[in-house]
């Protein structure tokens, strides 16, 4: 029973490593233009999240000031 469980685990690990190898074989380094585009999108996302946090923070701070003088 233990041997079959070990074989199953080893086969799963072997399949995972095979899939990782396949991904690494087809992946490539991004071009400069792709890198710049990814950086812009990431920066825009960070700014958007910061803005949403600010929009949530300001009313809460204002309401706290009204409740506790």
UniProtKB/Swiss-Prot annotation:
The keyword DNA-binding does not apply. It is a single-pass membrane protein. The chain crosses the membrane at residues 43-63. One of its GO terms (molecular function) is protein transmembrane transporter activity. Its main location: membrane. Gene3D superfamilies: Preprotein translocase SecE subunit. Essential subunit of the Sec protein translocation channel SecYEG. Clamps together the 2 halves of SecY. May contact the channel plug during translocation. This is Protein translocase subunit SecE. The gene is secE.
